Amino acid sequence: MNAMLIVAIVIAIIGTIPVIIRKKLLKNYLTLLQNNDIKAIKDLMATKLAKICIPPFNREYLLLNAYLKLKDDKQIDTQVNNIMDHVPMNSKQKSALAKSVFYIYVDNKNASMIDRLLEMVSTTNDHALYRQMDMVNDTLISGGIKYYDELKSDLEDEEYTKNNEDTPYLEFLLSVIYKNMGNESKSKEYKNKALEDSKGTVYESLIKSQN
């Protein structure tokens, strides 16, 4: 057999080994996750094989997902801070982390962690996510009206609202802005719209939890 061909085959085989091991590790992880076995998950992510085959962010993110499944706010907080303080992240990873935990901190009204996440996302190129987070923070946490004109204009545009799956949540945010302005009748009007339009959508439970 040609020597170069042998080298190519060996390289191909070596290249597939981490992939095979990674798949096996992730399969074990999913089994442990189903059983809510956090200690075993932590032990698994700390193994040499996991450290070789799974990048640092992915390992820590998998552990965070386990805490999210258990709704363990204390451990979620610890793990998020651990990732932000010690794990190098690219823009996509920063956005993924923020999306995973932002609304937990909104529900808990944890302004300091919301500020940390906003600062982190501001360093990415995900401008839409930053705007969404800033809008929620200003409206729900700070009691502001910064996005009043923008939301009012968007929601008065029938074409925009008809094709926008986010409409129920935008209606909810506008209802809160009206409340922040002291306009209870308009606040109630948009709150009722939000509750009605969110039925059967991903926003239904979110709006009710923040209502």
Please report, for each region that a protein language model flagged, where it lies by residue.
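Alpha-helical transmembrane signal-anchor/signal-peptide segments
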Residues: 26-38
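Acidic, Ser/Thr-rich low-complexity segments on the non-lumenal side of membrane proteins
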Residues: 41-73
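Residue at a conserved register position within TPR or TPR-like alpha-solenoid repeats
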Residues: 32, 67, 101, 105, ...
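Alpha-helical repeat scaffolds
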Residues: 40-48, 73-86, 110-125, 146-162, ...
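N-terminal signal-anchor transmembrane alpha helix of single-pass membrane proteins
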Residues: 1-29
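Structural motif corresponding to the intra-repeat A-B loop/turn of tetratricopeptide repeats
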Residues: 35, 70, 107-108, 142-145, ...
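Generic helix N-cap/helix-start motif at coil->alpha-helix transitions
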Residues: 17-27, 52-61, 90-99, 125-136, ...
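Extracytoplasmic/periplasmic C-terminal soluble domains
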Residues: 138-211
